[in-house]
């Protein structure tokens, strides 16, 4: 059994829960965060605003995906000032992080499969 096969059901369950399950943020926003993360991991420099991530999430999603370690309290306060709740901020952050993580996992597994 390959690494990909071993964890496929778990990854699928995680993705369904994060991107399709109920939440404070519309599923379409969480899915757009996932899609932006996948493109960013593949090397795309497309701005998040053009990838379907609505404002005010676009900058935050891109930062989570590319430079999560640079997120500060001021970034979170800016989202709150834009009218976003703690629950919405958490869900969108998780969607971007899981999207990036799954995209990186899939890339790594494809490289292993290719024998690199």
Region roles according to the model:
Residues 1-116:
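Hydrophobic alpha-helical segments
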């Amino acid at each position: 059994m390959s690494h990909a096969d071993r964890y496929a059901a778990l990854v699928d369950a995680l993705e369904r829960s994060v991107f399709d399950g109920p939440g404070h943020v519309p599923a379409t926003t969480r899915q757009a965060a996932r899609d932006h993360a996948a493109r960013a991991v593949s090397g795309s420099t497309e701005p998040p605003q053009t990838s379907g991530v609505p404002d005010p999430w676009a900058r935050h999603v891109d930062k989570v995906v590319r430079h999560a370690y640079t997120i500060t309290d001021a970034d979170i306060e800016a989202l709150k000032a834009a009218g976003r709740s703690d629950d919405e901020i958490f869900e969108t952050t998780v969607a971007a992080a899981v999207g990036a993580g799954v995209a990186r996992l899939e890339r790594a597994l494809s490289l292993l499969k290719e024998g690199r």
